[in-house]
Amino acid sequence: MPKQVVIPPGTGKPLAPYVPGTLADGVLYVSGTLPLDAEANVVHVGDAAAQTRHVLETIKGVVEAAGGTMDDVTFNHVFLADWADYAAINAVYAEYFPGEKPARYCIQCGLVKPEARVEIAAIAHIGR
């Protein structure tokens, strides 16, 4: 199966030369997703929970555009700007993965947009 680019309708312009998702051999790779609007402005500044919800809704859109659901997500890379947001981010994260949880790692680091509190990248196995 050839590589397929996945760009959901209404997706804004990326900050760099990448696409929201790439599907290859049934595996969807979702790029690092920041809490951005269509003009690449950070939304919900200062609210880690709202930013996490925005990020996960964006990821959900990419997964669905590839023909999957959030149940198909098998791995997440979670990047936090501040460990103080860990509990708030986890509370929202748990809403999107209520049953079987995907594997993940979580690290604190600087993000490309200083107002962003969280960035998440994902891997999903579509049609498993």
Curated annotation (Swiss-Prot):
GO terms for cellular component: cytosol. InterPro entries: RutC (IPR019898), RutC-like_sf (IPR035959), YjgF/YER057c/UK114 (IPR006175). It catalyses: (Z)-3-aminoacrylate + H2O + H(+) = 3-oxopropanoate + NH4(+). GO terms for biological process: nitrogen utilization; uracil catabolic process. Coiled coil: none annotated. Its EC number is 3.5.-.-. GO terms for molecular function: deaminase activity. Belongs to the RutC family. Involved in pyrimidine catabolism. Catalyzes the deamination of 3-aminoacrylate to malonic semialdehyde, a reaction that can also occur spontaneously. RutC may facilitate the reaction and modulate the metabolic fitness, rather than catalyzing essential functions. This is 3-aminoacrylate deaminase RutC. It comes from Methylobacterium radiotolerans (strain ATCC 27329 / DSM 1819 / JCM 2831 / NBRC 15690 / NCIMB 10815 / 0-1). The lineage of its organism: Bacteria, Pseudomonadati, Pseudomonadota, Alphaproteobacteria, Hyphomicrobiales.
